[in-house]
Amino acid sequence: MASSNFLVLLLFALFVIPQGLANYDKPPVYQPPVYKPPVEKPPVYKPPVEKPPVYKPPVYKPPVEKPPVYKPPVVKPPVYKPPVYKPPVYKPPVEKPPVYKPPVYKPPVYKPPVVKPPVYKPPVYKPPVEKPPVYKPPVYKPPVEKPPVYKPPVEKPPVYKPPVYKPPVYKPPVVKPPVYKPPVYKPPVYKPPVEKPPVYKPPVYKPPVEKPPVYKPPVYKPPVEKPPVYGPPHHP
C-alpha cells in the first residue's frame, strides 16, 4: 500500500517539474507598451425625480402615564468639620468718667384713709311672670304674578368643520370554531324540612301616660256693635 502511494507521488513530480522550469532556448520577446487615450463620456442629464406628496393622517398618541418612580431618600453621612480656632482678640478696657446726678427731692404726699360705710341691699322678690300665648292670625299674601319675559331666539352661525379623512382599516373576519359543551347533569339535592320551634314573646307592659292639663287663658272678645237699621215709615 505504501509503495503504491510512493509511485503515484513520483509520477506526479516527474510530470509537473519540467513544465515549471524556465525555457532558456528561446529568449523573451520585447513588446513596447501600447498607448490608449482616455475615453471621454459626455455627461448624462438625469432629470430630478418628483415624488407626489404622501398624505399621512394624524396619528393619535394617547398620553403616556408614567408610574411614580420611587426614589429612596439619600442618606448623607455626617461630615466632620473640625472646630475653627479663633485667637482671642484683646479689647482694652474703656474708661468712662463718672456722671454726677444731683439728688431729686420729692415732698411726701398725704393720703387720708378712705372709709366706706357698708351698703345694705335688701333682697328683691320677683314674682313669676306668666305670659299667655299670643295668637297671631295668618297673614294672607296674594300670589305675585310676573308677566312673561320675552327672550328673542339666539342665532348661532354655522361652524364649518372640514371632513377628516380616515383611511379604511381592513379587519379580517374572525372565525370562531363552534365549542361543544356537553350538558351538565346536576343530581337533585334533597333538603329536609326545617322545623322551627315556637318563639315565646312575653307581653309588653305599657304604663298609662298621664298628660297634664293644658292651660288656655280666656280670649277677650269685645262686643260687636251693630248700627241701627232704619226702615220705611208705617202709615196707620
Curated annotation (Swiss-Prot):
Per the UniProt entry, the signal peptide is: 1-22
| UniProt region (42 X 5 AA approximate tandem repeats of P-P-V-[EYV]-[KQG]), positions on chain | 27-236
Q: Name one GO molecular function term.
A: structural constituent of cell wall
Enumerate the sequence repeat regions by residue range. Answer: 27-31, 32-36, 37-41, 42-46, 47-51, 52-56, 57-61, 62-66, 67-71, 72-76, 77-81, 82-86, 87-91, 92-96, 97-101, 102-106, 107-111, 112-116, 117-121, 122-126, 127-131, 132-136, 137-141, 142-146, 147-151, 152-156, 157-161, 162-166, 167-171, 172-176, 177-181, 182-186, 187-191, 192-196, 197-201, 202-206, 207-211, 212-216, 217-221, 222-226, 227-231, 232-236
Which UniProt keyword terms apply here? Cell wall, Developmental protein, Repeat, Secreted, Signal
Localisation per UniProt entry: Secreted, Cell wall
Family affiliation: Belongs to the plant proline-rich protein superfamily. ENOD12 family.
Entry protein name: Repetitive proline-rich cell wall protein
Taxonomic source organism? Medicago sativa (Alfalfa)
Gene transcribed to yield this protein: PRP
